Amino acid sequence: MRIGTGIDVHQFAEGRKLIVGGVEIPHSKGLKGHSDADVLLHAISDALLGAAALGDIGKHFPDTSPQFKDIDSMILLQHVGKLIAEEGYAIGNIDSVLVMEKPKVAPHIMAMRGNIAACLDIDVSKVAVKATTTEKLGYVGREEGVAAHAICLIEERKQ
C-alpha cells in the first residue's frame, strides 16, 4: 500500500474557460495554464504519480511542450491511470479538496467525481471531492486563483 499527495495552484485569467474536475463551470474567468489548467485533475495526477514514485505531472507533461498546449486534463489523468496500472498498482481511493472563493462548485461535485472515476476506470465511491474557501484570506480569498489538494492510496494489483 502506498500513499501520494498532490497540490496544484492556478491563477485566474480573462478569456479562459473555468474547467475543474473535467466540468466547465460558468464563471467570468478561467484558469491560466499551458493545458486547460484543470487544477483538480493536476493535483490528483501528481498524487497518483507520487504514490507510484513516477515523478510529477511536469515530468510527464512539460509545459514547454507544444504537444500539451491547451490539452484536456482528462486525457492527462487517463494517461496517469494507465501508467499506474502498468506499474502493477490499483487505485484504492482518492480524496481531494478544492480551495476557492468563487464560484461555488457544490452543484458540480457529483459530475467531477463521475468524470474522475470514469477517466481512471474506478468506482465513483473511491473518489471524494470537497470544496472550501479561505474566508477571504490570501490569493484565494482575493479571488486571484484556485488551489487543489489531493491524496491517494494505491495498492499492488492482486495477481
From Swiss-Prot:
GO molecular function (one): metal ion binding
UniProt xrefs under Gene3D superfamilies: 2-C-methyl-D-erythritol 2,4-cyclodiphosphate synthase
Residues binding a divalent metal cation: D8, H10, H42
Pathway: Isoprenoid biosynthesis; isopentenyl diphosphate biosynthesis via DXP pathway; isopentenyl diphosphate from 1-deoxy-D-xylulose 5-phosphate: step 4/6
Keywords: Isoprene biosynthesis, Lyase, Metal-binding
UniProt remark on cofactor binding: Binds 1 divalent metal cation per subunit.
Keyword Lyase set for record: yes
Keyword Metal-binding belongs to the record: yes
UniProt cross-references to Pfam families, sorted A to Z: YgbB (PF02542)
Site label Transition state stabilizer, positions: H34, T133
Subunit structure: Homotrimer.
PANTHER family found in the cross-reference section: 2-C-METHYL-D-ERYTHRITOL 2,4-CYCLODIPHOSPHATE SYNTHASE, CHLOROPLASTIC (PTHR43181:SF1)
Function, as annotated: Involved in the biosynthesis of isopentenyl diphosphate (IPP) and dimethylallyl diphosphate (DMAPP), two major building blocks of isoprenoid compounds. Catalyzes the conversion of 4-diphosphocytidyl-2-C-methyl-D-erythritol 2-phosphate (CDP-ME2P) to 2-C-methyl-D-erythritol 2,4-cyclodiphosphate (ME-CPP) with a corresponding release of cytidine 5-monophosphate (CMP).
Family, as annotated: Belongs to the IspF family.
Protein name: 2-C-methyl-D-erythritol 2,4-cyclodiphosphate synthase
